[in-house]
């Protein structure tokens, strides 16, 4: 490889022609041993160390492997390593890593991408760019245009092996060596991800007419394959469900786990959307005396196969009606004050117009048609009164305990006495008072008897 004689940093030799005009030479490439000289003129790259870490792009871009001959720039060392026969083309290494049969599975290496960066939009853009580049490189297509066939579902590695791994139609003699060689080096995403991504049943593949002059759609066992037009003939389908074209162009194929064709998406949408909503009616009613809103949804669900028969379509038609009353109630413990009484005023008018009745028969509907706001106010007043009475009862009980404590001589000066202590001491004090009362009553009886005796003596002394 030729080396450049000019370099911005002292003591640095550029061996890569791609990095000849770079202001700072990167230090993470294989020729990093000869970057610096040991002479006294060499300076350590301490001031540029942070700039060197910014040279490599993040995330690293995949090297362009397919069109090395059309590019005007000289190939980089990564491309040369990927295209090196001694490093990647040995059959011993392919057998050791299990990559020997990947050449038949991947006819075109341009479609294969890294698993981390793959996507439907990137695939479509890449296929479009490849087809345009092939048309510009090979010339205008002779007949037809690019066609896509409906995908035959997600194919597992076992299914691919059953369908014939060697059935990938490749015209190696018509393609350049630069395009045909990296196909054996690419890794099929199906090997990395053995499980299918889209689990769909295989759709029946229509047979290509034998009298078609243009190239028919190339059908892959994994997914939709974009085949560039211009092939003179179409080979008969192989047991693996794969057709190959005998012209100069390859079928741009992708694995079933990675991509889906547009026609397959349309078929899946038709299968998924078996039922569609025909009628959606939204009705909102508001009563004059009530702020409650009732929303009525009428949904008619009619299947797509209604054209099979009128009786079957009528039997399968389904009408769903649902009323959604919107209640705004903040107190969840109280009973719901919302009563369906919106139709009460019309009934009351009909009754009053049909046959006039006394006032007593009209009063009950009025009591039923009270607004929720009035009922809420009544409930709040009732709860407020209950709270006031309960608070008053607790205050009276506390004051009675304090009074009882003041009457017990042992607890007069004890302000922190508990209610249980107050009750016990008060009971003992009452028992002592009762005993004292009994003694006093006995003494009173004795005194009364003594008084009677003295009165009798006084009367006897007067009579004598």
Swiss-Prot record:
User: Positions of the region Interaction with AURKA and FBXW7?
Assistant: 61-89
Sum up the protein's function in the record's words: Positively regulates the transcription of MYCNOS in neuroblastoma cells.
Cellular component (GO) terms are:
chromatin; nucleolus; nucleoplasm; nucleus
Q: How does it assemble?
A: Efficient DNA binding requires dimerization with another bHLH protein. Binds DNA as a heterodimer with MAX. Interacts with KDM5A, KDM5B and HUWE1. Interacts with MYCNOS. Interacts with AURKA; interaction is phospho-independent and triggers AURKA activation; AURKA competes with FBXW7 for binding to unphosphorylated MYCN but not for binding to unphosphorylated MYCN. Interacts with FBXW7; FBXW7 competes with AURKA for binding to unphosphorylated MYCN but not for binding to phosphorylated MYCN.
Name of encoding gene: MYCN
- Record's disease association: Amplification of the N-MYC gene is associated with a variety of human tumors, most frequently neuroblastoma, where the level of amplification appears to increase as the tumor progresses.
Q: What does altering residue 29 to A do?
A: Reduces interaction with AURKA
Domain of life, per lineage: Eukaryota
At which residues is Phosphothreonine found? 58
**Region (Leucine-zipper) spans which residues?**
433-454
Compositional bias of type Low complexity: which residue ranges?
149-159, 208-233
What name has this protein been given in UniProt?
Answer: N-myc proto-oncogene protein
| CDD domains named in the record | bHLHzip_N-Myc_like
In what residue span(s) does the bHLH domain sit? 381-433
The record's subcellular locations are: Nucleus
Q: What does UniProt say about this protein's domains? A: The 9aaTAD motif is a transactivation domain present in a large number of yeast and animal transcription factors.
InterPro entries recorded: bHLH_dom, HLH_DNA-bd_sf, Myc_transcription_factors, Tscrpt_reg_Myc, Tscrpt_reg_Myc_N
Region Interaction with AURKA, residue ranges: 19-47
Q: How is it modified after translation?
A: Phosphorylated by GSK3-beta which may promote its degradation. Phosphorylated by AURKA.
State the tissue distribution: Expressed in the neuronal cells of the cerebrum, neuroblastomas and thyroid tumors (at protein level).
* UniProt feature, compositional bias: Acidic residues: 259-278
**What are the protein's GO molecular function terms?**
DNA binding; DNA-binding transcription activator activity, RNA polymerase II-specific; DNA-binding transcription factor activity; DNA-binding transcription factor activity, RNA polymerase II-specific; kinase binding; protein dimerization activity; RNA polymerase II cis-regulatory region sequence-specific DNA binding; sequence-specific double-stranded DNA binding
